[in-house]
Amino acid sequence: MPLRSLFHTNQSSHDKDALTRGGYNAYLESLSRCDSGKAEEQKGKVISKLLEKKDVRALRYIGLGPLGFVNNSLRKDCWYELLASQLLIDDATEYITPVEKHKDEGQVILDAERSFGGIVDKNLKLQLRKLLVELITRVLRKYPTLNYYQGYHDIVSVFIMCFSWNVTKENGLELENLSLQEEIDMERLFYCIEAFTLLYLRDFMMNSLDFSFEQLRVISSLIKESNMKFYNLFKFDENEPLFAIGSILTIFAHNLKPIDSGDNNLHKILFQIFDMTISMQSMRLPLIIYKNLLLQNASEISKQIEANSDFFENDFDLRHGAIQTVLQKKLYDEALWEEVLQITRKDATTASKKALKRVSLNKYSALLNTACGKPGCFDMSTIIFYLSEQTKMNEHYKEEKYHGVAARSKTRALVQRLGHFLPSKYNRWSKISLLIGIVAILYQLRTTRSLSLVLNLRYMISTKLKDLSHININLHHVSHIWVDPIRDILKLGHPTR
């Protein structure tokens, strides 16, 4: 399926445009035959014309192709036009009651102090960090139901570097006299960060990782669809791809930080990943990229697993360790990344919907609406509704998990206490009768919550255990501990008829 079919381009309105119809594919293919400098120059001219015409549909397609939006001077304008077409925000409207200070601001400051480590100039580094804190804080205060997560600052850093690149790299300004905020279009920058956060990152900005883990499971499902042999070798049905959490939460910004001097090729790779994600309006795309990154290294990962199988006690550690070892070595392999992105461009639009259907996603996930790969425009009332429902669902998940852990903890404590009265070995039937008694206790406590019941249960259990506590009893020869535990317990609290 050609990519342009996703964008529903009105071909009749562009009959004279050289980039329409089949011209898109032919044009992008011709660029691949040019040397990189000439290709960047040619594509840059095309993007400039599309920006002049505000041709968002064409920009979407161009952004998916090789070189993305070419350079940050063009990229910042392309990102703004695309994100502004995806989300309508009225600055005069207060969608959620803001707060004066968000609970996560302390962590934001700590993470900002570790950011932009590759920037040599101290004044510039200080200004970048200050800007990072200001932008993140502004988002959090405006939408206080969002929760900051470690990694969000990496994503915001990408937008900052994109918008400030010309100021710090090309204009030759004296850095000691530089006022970054005066040189950057701050309102456009904030709009991009705000829109990207609300459209693409909602799943990650809850106060638990449940929705984030749901997205990781999509990677397993995509691998199952693409390479069943590797899926079985890694045992993805048993081992969740938790190793991918850092890459997905930051859309690879943590792996390929744009903070060193010069516009090197790895920075271009990172910016192209964002170009593709925004152009396709899809948070599925980073998951597909990660899947392709794994499969391109499947052979080496398999060898690593085989070579180290004797050194790990469990499959989970073995397989996760193998993947981390291989990917860490390949992290700065430019040729590998180029190959992965090219494969992704070909299969991003054909990745089967079955891969998503096999994963239980919350129904308000960005993967299913605002960043599902189908370009569309959303109003803020819809976004606030999604955010509100996801927040409620997240709290429900947490509550269920808490009660589940609490119940398991109470059961474990009860069994441990019983163990103090019993030798380590005893008759099998004694064991079964005692277990049945415990189950009956839990059932009765769940259905009847009266103090008298608790006291009666306490008396009954203590009596049973007292009978077993005499040191001369040999439990190997005891035929039973509790003859009829269900009858004894369930009749408690019920009047005799």
UniProtKB/Swiss-Prot annotation:
Additional free-text comment from the UniProt record = Present with 573 molecules/cell in log phase SD medium.
Question: What's the name of the protein?
Answer: GTPase-activating protein GYP8
Q: Which Pfam families has this protein been placed in?
A: RabGAP-TBC
The species this protein belongs to is: Saccharomyces cerevisiae (strain ATCC 204508 / S288c) (Baker's yeast)
Among the GO molecular function terms of this UniProt record, one is: GTPase activator activity
Q: What is the lineage of its organism?
A: Eukaryota, Fungi, Dikarya, Ascomycota, Saccharomycotina
Gene Ontology terms: cellular component: cytoplasm; endoplasmic reticulum membrane; peroxisome
The disulfide bonds in this chain are none
Superkingdom of origin organism:
Eukaryota
Q: Which UniProt key words apply to this protein?
A: GTPase activation
Q: Which Gene3D superfamilies match?
A: 1.10.8.1310, Ypt/Rab-GAP domain of gyp1p, domain 3
An example GO biological process term is: endoplasmic reticulum to Golgi vesicle-mediated transport
All copies of the Rab-GAP TBC domain together span 69-281
Xref: PROSITE patterns:
TBC_RABGAP
